[in-house]
Amino acid sequence: MEKLQGHRELDRSWQHNFFYPLIFQEYIYVFAYDHALNKLILLENAIAKKSSLLIVKRLITRMYQQNHFILSVNDSNQNEIFGHKHKKNLYSQMITEGFAVIVEIPFSLLLISSLEGKEIVESQNLRSIHSIFPFLEDKFLHLNYVLDILIPYPAHLEILVQTLRYWLKDASSLHLLRYFLYEYRNWNSLIRPKESISPFSKRNRRLFLFLYNLLVYEYESLFVILRKQSSYLRSTSFGALLERIHFYGKLKYLVKVKVKVFGVILWLFKEPFLHYVRYQGKCLLASKGTSFLMYKWKYYFIAFWQCHFSVWSQPRRIYINQLSNYSLDFMGFISNVGLNSSVIRSQMLENSFLVDNIIKKFDTIVPIIPLVGSLAKAKFCNGLGHPISKSVWTDLSDADIIDRFGRICRNLSHYYSGSSRKKSLYRIKYILRLSCARTLSRKHKSTVRAFLKRLGSEFLEEFFTEEEKVLSLILPRDSSTLSGFYRGRVWYLDIICIHNLANDE
């Protein structure tokens, strides 16, 4: 524990103690509501020690002068139109956005200082969420078991404050953070939405997302330290009987450690084939070991969260599965390791025989049912997947309607381009194309057939990606290269987030 605590304090030696005055900076709130600004400008301004109480007074005055009559019909607690409650919530929300920008500053400064003096070429490929799948294709084929883990979140809000206290020793800011956390007691639903990850999920609030990522960073930083020293304890007298199948393969990883407390010698086996992947609130831990070792890792995680962070994780949130007969629901894909059989005829002299080769393949499948459900929720189709018109878009121009449908279709094609089976993706594109045609025909009070006959192929080209347009111009329709492109798997390394497509209005 002394080593872990020393490592945590070493990383936080750069920390800044006074960020509370930044709340009085007007550019903080401008940046919070205009994400197109350059973050470097914010960091440069953060260094300048200029603050004005008059700026905040003006901001509060403008917030109170805004129209507060736009309220949610479904929220009965917000129906006090002439009361003070809605104004208070609006004020808290705006200050929360500014506070989120402030607490992000020290971490941005840490990133800049760590890159100084290092020749590191910035690459979007390293940030792409699609870069995870080539890694899975390369590693998971040689592994046996996987832990499917839902990362727990703290039941008590004070744990979040204590986590940030290691990084930001500003009592005023921490008290303000407590106020925001208790103001939004339903933060669990903001951080971890109940619906599965999809391109149609709503964006989370900035402050709560930051706090959640900080908490996960604390989990992972300590986990990496323990992983470097991690091993599986073996008793000396029973060392020869443990994992006899893999004994000779792991003999070189055998080390001898003397434990001072008990005065005995323990044997440790390091696990060389252990891979960890995380996206949002879900992580995967895959290993080449046996199921017994994975059970040890499972209860190790439970004890790790409970002892170090006072976070209780139920065992049913961690599943142990064998990769050969399990499908992973990860990042909007259904992934599994399948076995493909190929028969090869071999001939030696006058004798010929058939050889059956079994090849492992990592498949990624488009989850058609959740996607159709998301389209139905966004009013592009009904619950059975039959396209319907988007009535709320009929007031737009024809070009805007086609552009919106086409952009959603292209983004989906872009994200699910690495799918092993494109039939489900073709169905989604069909729903969007026909929904667009029904929307336009409803606007012009015409039939879908007459509308498609009038526009022709120009209407369909709006739903193609740029790669499909270029290849369709260069290659003929019956070309094997073009058909191979539609069937092949392509991972785009420029995707850094899943966009909110349903509410793109």
Curated annotation (Swiss-Prot):
Whether Secreted counts among this entry's keywords is: no
Protein family according to the UniProt entry: Belongs to the intron maturase 2 family. MatK subfamily.
- A GO CC term assigned to this protein in UniProt: chloroplast
Xref: Pfam families = Intron_maturas2, MatK_N
- Record keywords: S-adenosyl-L-methionine included? no
InterPro entries registered for this protein in UniProt: Domain_X (IPR024937), Maturase_MatK (IPR002866), Maturase_MatK_N (IPR024942)
User: What is the annotated role of this protein in its UniProt record?
Assistant: Usually encoded in the trnK tRNA gene intron. Probably assists in splicing its own and other chloroplast group II introns.
Question: Which protein are we looking at?
Answer: Maturase K
| Record localization | Plastid, Chloroplast
Q: Which UniProt keywords apply?
A: Chloroplast, mRNA processing, Plastid, RNA-binding, tRNA processing
Q: Name one GO biological process term.
A: mRNA processing
The record lists the organism as: Amaranthus greggii
GO MF terms on file?
Answer: RNA binding
